[in-house]
Amino acid sequence: MDRRDFLDLLAKGTSLGLLLKLAPLGMLEFVRAQSSATSFQKALLVDKAGNPFKLSTLKPHEPFVFAYPFAATPNILVNVDAELSPVEVKMPDGKNYRWPGGVGKGRNIVAYTSICPHAYSYAAPNLGAMGYYKPEGNRGPRMVCCAHLSSFDVTRGGEVRGGPAPHALAAVALEYDAAKDEAYAVGFLGNPQFDEFFRAQNQALRNLFRTTARAREEVSKATVIPYAEHTKVPTTCPVLG
């Protein structure tokens, strides 16, 4: 199936789940078909021992972190304990895109960049400005940046629910192998703003990685670790929206 066929079927309303089964390139082809998406080097998610990470081992609402596509750009991976369907995510520049929903056997697993699109605060190893907040009362699960209280709905493609963030949180595109219960990161949906992030965090990243080249090194395998092990000082703050 080529890109034109893929887009034609998507426009005709063919289910995304079926398309990803039909398309040989799966999620990677889906990313390339989006107007607001970026593909990067494909990276297998692995555990600390280097073995393929099994998505079914994720417990509900316990966040994990993996660096992708660069050594210095952490993402948050979490089981939200609910099946998530595709949604249309609106962008201020008009380059809206289709978020494919959750992955995994229960379609309940999502991954997003931890870099806030407002001022590029993130889940740094020394201070976790961006974190995951499990559902509470009538509020669903959120990712929140405690720097300026931007809140993002992880069940709806990372759309903004509160705070000054100008657009949705970029979602990691995960290609899931159901037979092996493994996943590959293949790119991002939305605008991850990596160039802006590296400029804003230049000195801090040099302190962590010694050189910009090391910070920007692309990963071929993405090691998944608990959020609590990645970030020495997590932050908590009110959840807006």
Where are these regions (language model features)?
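N-terminal secretory signal peptides and thylakoid transit peptides that target proteins
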Residues: 1-18
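Hydrophobic membrane-targeting alpha-helices
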Residues: 18-26
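N-terminal pre-ligand scaffold of iron-sulfur
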Residues: 28-132, 176-241
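Short beta-strand-alpha-helix junction that forms the catalytic/metal-binding core
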Residues: 106-112, 136-145
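Detector for the c-type heme attachment site
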Residues: 119-121, 147-151
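Polybasic, low-complexity binding patches
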Residues: 129, 136-141, 154-186
